[in-house]
A protein has these predicted regions:
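Early transmembrane hairpin of solute transport permeases
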Residues: 31-131
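N-terminal signal-anchor module of multipass membrane proteins
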Residues: 6-41, 45
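Acidic-glycine-rich active-site phosphate/pyrophosphate-binding loop
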Residues: 1-11, 42-56, 238-257, 289-307, ...
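Signature of multi-pass transmembrane helix bundles
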Residues: 109-257, 424-432
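Hydrophobic alpha-helical bundle architecture
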Residues: 38, 282-295, 305-371, 384-394
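Flexible, glycine/charged-enriched surface loops at secondary-structure junctions
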Residues: 44-48, 88-93, 114-117, 193-199, ...
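Conserved phosphate/anionic-ligand binding catalytic regions in large, soluble enzymes, centered on
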Residues: 20-36, 260-277, 319-322
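A structural signal for small-residue-enriched, beta-sheet-centric alpha/beta enzyme cores
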Residues: 2, 22-25, 55-56, 143-147, ...
Length: 432
């Protein structure tokens, strides 16, 4: 068992990285930043200016905003200013009503919102919101993670500036323990169960999102389609088909704008879904014990957090690669696998899915989620037969942690030019 102080640091990390969110986290982070700038202004803004990193723009252009029936940033910004409360974090617009939605639509129609790409920055997650009214101005900036405010200014007075601290090399709030896969395994499998039972909240949130998808036609209805007779004829009424259905359904609801919270992982709701629902469904149908489920969910979520430590909050790689690697580990554990089997599953996932491009948050993410979950199951099955991709093949290293770093190096560094090209394609398409 890991030492108590190490366990406490990991638990603190999980509590910060596995949190509820309503809607896609990028537009919600923009709404959150808008809400804070509005609070600093102290009145309803007459004008709002947004300066955003390319990855924020990419992930917010085509996704449904919960409870609005609309997509994109203008309505998210409008609602952040009109009803948003920064204390709600990524549930910032949960007080939405039909009346305030109409106010938000009216605000958008008045062309009060200006959205631009922030030039000259390297940070992939950057949100700068400036609100103006009555000759007053207030600015809030979020950077690095979806709820991390680094700058606040009102009426020319700087109230918060973590950017200066970072530039001068002074200590910042980054206290995250640096993980490796063996540490993740040891924590998940040996920590006293009462210390990690909180992870069951992810099950409650994300399985509820899957049920919500059945109440409407969200996104491309990938999950609902998996439940229909034709799909049953092809895939059978099996654990495999149930896992795909429950995971894709939750993604359908979230990307389609359902007003339903999910438990996110590392700033992504879809990653939270992928790290949760496959493990929950497998544990139920495999008749695993409640304790085994808790440990499998912990292993899944913490594996995803570990990989994201190296990759960063946003990248050119589709996040389902990361989260489904986590769920593959969780399923492998539920199958009775040991640490070696977990390593095999991780290597199989990296060998299969590396290179899947993130082209923004949108309803079709449910298709990528289905591909990721399918690969997670296959990787787990192969690992339990001691079959795995070896160091003689591609980017896989004998050391599993080096294999993970190979994956993250590609996503964080090598694919930057591709990320720019993806955004250029997205912003220069003809009218839909």
């Amino acid at each position: 068992m890991l030492e108590k102080n190490i366990r406490e640091q990991i638990i603190d990390l999980m509590h910060r990285q596995v949190v509820p969110a309503v809607g896609c986290t990028e537009p919600m982070a923009v709404a959150l930043c808008t809400a804070r700038a509005t609070e600093l202004l102290g009145q309803k803004p007459e004008k709002i200016s947004a300066f955003l990193s390319a990855n924020i723009l990419k992930n917010a252009m085509g996704v449904g905003i919960p409870g609005t029936g609309m997509i994109g940033l203008p309505i998210a910004i409008s609602l952040g200013a009109l009803i948003g409360k920064s204390e709600y974090q990524l549930e910032v617009i949960k007080d939405l009503t039909p009346e305030t939605l109409e106010e938000g639509k009216q605000y958008v129609s008045e062309n009060r919102i200006d959205i631009k790409l922030k030039e000259g920055i390297t940070e992939k997650l950057y949100i700068e919101m400036t609100c103006e009214a009555g000759g007053k101005k207030a600015t809030a900036i979020i950077s690095k993670t979806h709820t991390n405010f680094v700058y606040e200014e009102a009426d020319g007075k700087v109230l918060l500036d973590k950017q200066v601290l970072a530039e001068e090399g002074a200590p910042t709030d980054n206290k995250d323990i640096q993980l490796n896969l063996k540490m993740v395994w040891d924590f998940a499998t040996t920590t006293p169960i009462n210390e990690i039972e909180f992870i069951l909240e992810a099950k409650r949130y994300n399985m509820n999102a899957a049920e919500e998808a059945l109440k409407g036609n969200y996104g491309h209805c990938v999950g609902k389609t998996m439940d229909r007779p034709l799909s049953r004829g092809l895939f059978g009424n099996s654990i495999y088909s149930h896992i795909l259905s429950k995971t894709a359904s939750a993604c359908d609801a979230r990307m389609g704008g359902a007003m339903v919270p999910v438990m996110s992982n590392s700033g992504s709701g879809n990653q939270g879904i992928c790290a949760t629902n496959p493990v929950v469904v497998f544990a139920k149908e495999n008749e695993n014990t409640p304790e085994e489920l808790v440990r499998a969910l912990t292993l899944s979520h913490l594996t995803a957090i570990y990989i994201k430590q190296n990759l960063g909050a946003l990248s050119a790689l589709c996040g389902c690669i990361v989260a489904c690697t986590g769920s593959s580990c969780g399923i492998t554990y539920l199958m009775g696998g040991d640490y070696n089997n977990i390593c095999y599953a991780v290597k199989n996932m990296i060998a299969n899915l590396t290179g899947m491009v993130c082209d923004g948050a949108k309803p079709s993410c449910a298709l990528k989620v289905s591909s990721g979950v399918s690969t997670a199951i296959l990787s787990a099955m192969l690992s339990m037969e001691n079959h795995h991709v070896t160091e003689a093949e591609g980017i896989i290293d004998k050391d599993v942690d080096k294999s993970i770093r190979n994956l993250t190096s590609l996503g964080k560094d090598a694919m930057n030019e591709m990320d720019i090209m993806v955004l250029d394609i997205m912003t220069n398409k003809g009218a839909c």
